[in-house]
Regions:
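Catalytic-core "active-site belt" of small-molecule-metabolizing enzymes
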Residues: 2-206, 212, 240-243, 247, ...
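A conserved acidic, glycine/proline-rich C-terminal tail/linker
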Residues: 207-243
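Hydrophobic, well-ordered secondary-structure scaffolds
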Residues: 224, 248-249
Length: 263
């Protein structure tokens, strides 16, 4: 465990409760490994649970785009999602509640059966038969320049998940494509602006392999994937917070998800 672990944990906890908390320079001066950051993150989860929150699901990080391998080749840390922040499509979230951050289109899997230590891509596919179009709501609590292990300790910036209607998970997601649309409040509601479209191939790790890696890593830290948990496996298109509606469209029959940030 890192020498400053108690102080780091308290600082991270204060940021979880108030992202505008003045953390000083301890986070910028700290270098954490993936495992050190993960251990601190699990303690953050325990604090939330002790306050009466429930665990709702998980994310696996550093699987897509520029974040891949930020902690080293093949290292894929996890983050937790609070049940109170698992929100349905169409949710309206006050913009002021979120501080800094952005929305990211992510495929959201719903776990059907437990998955843990011996997970493989094949067993993961069998354990998560449903998938939904989703948004991850990311909150930037850390000062710029923190090392990747500190980002893990801060729960990989997760604030919550918005998910649409679940469908049978396609067996082959290699040609999944996701388009993000935005509709600022000062634009006619019938008019949307496409932010961008990203295809799975070459952008993101195999989803089912990511689920297996997540299950095995959770086992290393005393957890596993449980029925009805939501799991997100990596970002597609993203956009900074702004007032208005966002829509994500997922092909392959997965469908749409909506979230509004209100003033």
């Amino acid at each position: 465990m890192h020498n400053d672990a108690p102080k780091l944990l308290e600082t991270l906890w204060q940021l979880q409760k108030d992202p505008d908390f003045n953390a000083g320079d301890i986070l910028l001066k700290t270098e954490l490994s993936a495992d050190e950051g993960q251990a601190l993150q699990v303690q953050l989860l325990e604090r939330w649970l002790n306050e009466g929150e429930a665990l709702g699901g998980w994310k696996i990080g550093m699987t897509s785009g520029e974040s891949r391998d930020a902690l080293g080749p093949g290292i894929r840390p996890f983050g937790f999602v609070l049940a109170s922040r698992m929100l349905p499509s169409g949710t309206d979230i006050p913009r002021a509640q979120l501080f800094r951050g952005g929305v990211e289109n992510e495929l959201c899997f719903i776990v059907d059966s437990p998955l843990g230590e011996n997970a493989t891509a094949e067993s993961a596919q069998a354990a998560v038969r449903r998938a939904a179009p989703g948004f991850e709501i990311n909150q930037k609590r850390l000062p710029p320049g923190c090392n990747a292990g500190v980002r893990v300790a801060d729960n990989l910036s997760n604030w919550g998940i918005v998910a649409g209607t679940a469908v049978a998970a396609p067996a082959d997601l290699k040609d999944l494509a996701v388009t993000l649309y935005r509709n600022p409040e000062d634009v006619d509601p019938r008019t949307e602006q496409a932010v961008g479209r990203i295809e799975s191939a070459g952008h993101i790790d195999d989803h089912f392999e990511s689920l297996a890696i997540l299950a095995r890593r959770l086992h290393d830290f005393g957890h596993r994937l449980e029925p009805d948990q939501w799991v997100i496996t990596g970002a597609y298109e993203k956009h900074p917070f702004e007032i208005g509606e966002f829509r994500g469209h997922f092909n392959k029959g997965i469908g749409d998800v909506h979230v509004t940030l209100s003033g």
